[in-house]
Structures are given as C-alpha cells and as structure tokens.
C-alpha cells in the first residue's frame, strides 16, 4: 500500500464544489482545507504508483484545480 499527500492549488471560489467531486474519487482517505501555500491537502491510499497517477489525473480534471503536487509518504511515525 502506498500512502501519499496530494497538495492542491485552487482557483478562488471553487473549493466547495471541488471537494464534492473529490468525495467521489476512490482511494482518497481524507480531504482537508488548509491555510497557506496550498488550498486543499488530500491523503491518498493506493496499491501502486500507476493507481496514484490515475488518482492525481482525476483530481487534475476537476474544475478549479490549478496545480497539484504529490508527496509520497516513505515512513510514518505514530505518536
């Protein structure tokens, strides 16, 4: 299983609509609206890199999505 964060830049005014579309995408474990450089951070859980590519492709086709940056989680430490 591969876990990754997909960091998303949105056009203003499209966040709520985009979230509704993202909720339809398989492999997304969490969607967070954040302040700062990015507007939305999504956590994806996929079987392989090909599936991750398909997931990011689906996100990139959503209206208002300007740019995505994907960060694959190499190691996670539970506190």
Pin down the residues of each PLM region.
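A compositional/biophysical signature of low hydrophobicity enriched in polar/charged and small residues
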Residues: 1-79
């Amino acid at each position: 299983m591969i876990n990754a964060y997909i960091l998303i830049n949105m056009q203003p005014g499209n966040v709520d609509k985009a979230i509704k579309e993202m909720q339809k995408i398989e492999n997304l474990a969490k969607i967070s609206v954040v302040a700062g450089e990015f507007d939305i951070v999504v956590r994806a859980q996929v079987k392989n890199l090909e599936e991750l590519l398909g997931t990011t492709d689906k996100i990139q086709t959503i209206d208002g999505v300007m740019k995505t940056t994907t960060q694959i989680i190499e190691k996670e430490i539970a506190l």
